[in-house]
Amino acid sequence: MNYRKLSSAFVTFGLLCPLSTEAIHAQELDKNEVKVEIAQPGLTIGKLTQPQNDTKENIAKKYLKGEVNGAKAQQEQVTSEKNVDFQPTNKETKENQTELRLAQTYKNYKVYGQDLIVKVDKNGVITTVSGKVAQNLDQQPNLTITNFLSKNEVKSKLRNILQIPSDATETEFSSETVVYKKKDGHYTYATVLTFTYENNEQVINGNAIMDLQTGEVLFQEKFIKNKENKTINQVTAPKLSPAKEPGTGKNALQENVLFNIAKGTDGKFYLADLSRGNGIYIYNADYADSLGGDSQAGYPGTLISSNTSNFADKEAAGVMKNMSNIYDYFKKEHNLKSYDNKDSKVVASVHGFDSTEVSDGVKENYVNAFWHPSWNQMVFGDGLNGKLTSALDVTAHEFGHAVFSGTTKNKIVRYPSAETSALNEGLADFWGTQIEYYVKKDKGNWIMGDTLGGLTIRDIPREIGDGGNKLYTNLQDFYNDGNDQESHVNSGIISHVLYQLAEGKTYNGIAVQKQGNEKVSKVVMRALQNYATSAEDFESLQSHIVQAAKDLYGNTTSTEFEKAFQAHGYKALAKISKVVEVQQGK
């Protein structure tokens, strides 16, 4: 296909003559007119094609490849590069339309973390496209190279870099070649690796991403499990059923807590709530090192049990109580079943550890928690005498990460950009505050970790981040040379927007009307469930949240949302911009 530029706003694929005023007017009167209603960064809405007689998957793929005659699209959402294709990865029916999620490929390799959402109505008309296409891949010099490292060379380099013992035998090794965007913005071929090695003393497993041309490891994580207590590690929980009585315990704040538990066929009680979806399970990780080092049990560890319905483990009791409230919030307020709307099992490990974050080597001093997307679980350390596990907002923050992974169908081991990572952190903080307000009512606040006894994780209203450092809240700060684009530091660029909206504050001279927590949270959830993609960036999320506000509450509300984004350095959203009109060459 050839291109010929008609104007700054329209581009044609093939041959297309400029339309006269009369022709435009005639089209507007045509009920079958193909037209764009919304064209904003990462989002196009309207009647974007004529009815198509094909499978929904083919309709979506042809649109993204610029092959649907007469279609309207944004330039950032289509490509004519012959080596680019799109692979359907998920299909759902939503609001009487078929919603498809498609992963972009180049020369049959997935572009890492790059996907789009296309909605097709019953007549084969595309109504919504969300996300962006990676452009100009043919111009990337590293993607013309075909002399990749061999599989044996990859394995050899991996063993050397990760310092795998020479006597360790490979028991698992899988790889997927992808097109990967490096920090410098250039694309290269890389391989995403999952591995397990084992000798008489240890089992070593993890993930890595390696440049297939240079052998550079672009990302790595490894986990080492000692075998000295192998008989303990092999113990499995008996068959469980819901216990008749509730579980009791005290959290790290010495508060009495109640929660559902299970009873095993061995007569013991277990920290497993079988009443919520496919269950909430709390494990003892026994200070396994999450990034390599000594470990007795590994993750998730051993399912926590007790001879009575009372559980003495204060960290476990605190997390179980919090998880119950968090699950209920998402189901009752957003009809979200578990973190992925598939009612997946919720797994959390207490007594976690990361040797890289504890300077004194005392495992009980690990003051952190995390969601691990590859393991599909959360991990909590014992730091601050266990108070971390009792902090509802901290627990909800980690569950918020799971929600981001689950709603965007994101199973990648590393987020594709610093923007995606920052948004993920900011939204996790947002869910932390929302659940605290849901449970504690008027005692909720926008301070992450306010119950930790002097250690504030992030104070969103005062723009204070980790360690008392500045929390960036303006999008333009993200691009400053002095900003290393660390995700937690930049999380305020979205969380402070949502704070302003919920509370009705004036920021940088721009006032917005108070929307309240319930309204803002429903808008954010709609954006995540209907528009957000795995490679979400700041300007795309702005488009998606503003559109979600319009979907639910109309133009007046969406205008307030847009004002809040502008107060934080985001550009004003044009209703229609960068439109492409497609016509197949003959």
Provide a role label for each language-model segment.
Residues 27-231, 342-370, 580-586:
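Segments that shape or occlude catalytic/ligand-binding pockets
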Residues 8, 17-36:
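Sec-dependent signal peptide cleavage junction
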Residues 399:
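Active-site neighborhood of glycoside hydrolase catalytic domains
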Residues 12-13, 24, 432:
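Cleavable N-terminal signal peptides
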